[in-house]
Structure formats: C-alpha cells, structure tokens
Amino acid sequence: WLPNADAVLWFHREVLPLVRGECPEVQFYVVGKNPPLAIQQLAEPETIHVTGFVADVEEYMAQTAVFVIPLRVGGGMKLLQALAMARAVVSTSIGAEGIAVTHGQDILLADNATEFARCVVQLLRDPELRMRLGQNGRKLIETFYSWETATDSLESAYRHAIQPKTR
C-alpha cells in the first residue's frame, strides 16, 4: 500500500538516522505482507528487519518499546490496534486522524522528522512515560472504541431512527 511504503521510506531516510544518533542500538521492524522492493532493500542484519507476511502481527507489536506511525497520507487501523495493546505510540497527526487521541496523554504526535525523532527517543529513554501512554491509550480504546461501545452507539442510533415521530 503506497501510504505505508511512503511512511516507512520517510521514517528510514529522515527520522531513523536522528534516532540512531541518540540511541544507536535501536532496531526498526517493518511488519506486513508484500513489502515493495524499495522496503525490502532497507533490511540490515541486526538493525532493520523487514518481515513480510507474519501470521500474528500482535506478536511483534507486543515486543515493541515504541510503535511508530509515520503516515503522511492515508490512515488505517494500526493506531487503534497499537492502543488496544497498550503500546506507546508516536504518530503523525495524519496517522491519528479521526481518532480522539490527545498528544502527551495517550500518544505523542509529531509532523516533522526532528520532532518525530525527539518523541521516539523520549519514549525509548523513559519507560514510565511509555507505560503511562500505553495504559491511557488502552483506556481510550475501552472507553470509546470497544465493540461494546460501538454496538451501544449503533443500538442507540437504530432506536432513534425507528422511534415514532411525534407532532
């Protein structure tokens, strides 16, 4: 998917060198089916891992210190999945579009390479902040995006739609 490839290439080119300047031991995982050749060629032993298809994405997500969503166009379910798993997330505002997140409370948002790298490094160095953001993100999902909440909202909309009109 082009937006994902663009995000990975931008992160690799613009953000990762800045992160490595502060945290040289950092590893970057690109997980997902059918990565284009340009993404596959980023792989470096011990530092950049391009997996291709994996049976269980959550297995990789559970092991991340920081989940990055460097999208510059598009959107998707990655953020909701990461928050549901209580992962600390750094995203562009585009990657978080349409989701009721608050910068510094349940996510860190950054729209340029320098700020994105600063947020990633901050989370890598601060396990308490990672835990707090992860827990707050999980609460956000439970409160606003769980199946129970979604079905309650849908039921309410149906009830309202079929309610007899009064004059």
Question: Where are these predicted regions, by residue range?
Answer:
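Acidic donor-binding loop of glycosyltransferase active sites
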Residues: T47, F53, A62-M77, R87-A88
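Flexible glycine-rich beta->alpha loop in the catalytic core of nucleotide-sugar glycosyltransferases
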Residues: A55, V73-G74, A88, I94-E97, ...
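Conserved catalytic-core segment of nucleotide-activated headgroup transferases in glycan assembly
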Residues: W1-Q63
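A structural motif in glycosyltransferase catalytic domains
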Residues: V8-H12, F28, A82, F116, ...
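Conserved donor-binding/catalytic loop of nucleotide-activated donor transferases
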Residues: A62-T64, Q81-I94, T102-H103
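Conserved acidic donor-binding segment of nucleotide-sugar-dependent glycosyltransferases
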Residues: H103, I107-T114, Q122-P127
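A short, well-ordered alpha-helix in the C-terminal region of glycosyltransferases
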Residues: L129-T143, A150-S156, H160
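Short glycine/proline-enriched, acidic/aromatic patches that form the donor-sugar handling elements
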Residues: L37-I39, V57-E58, G75-G76, G95-A100
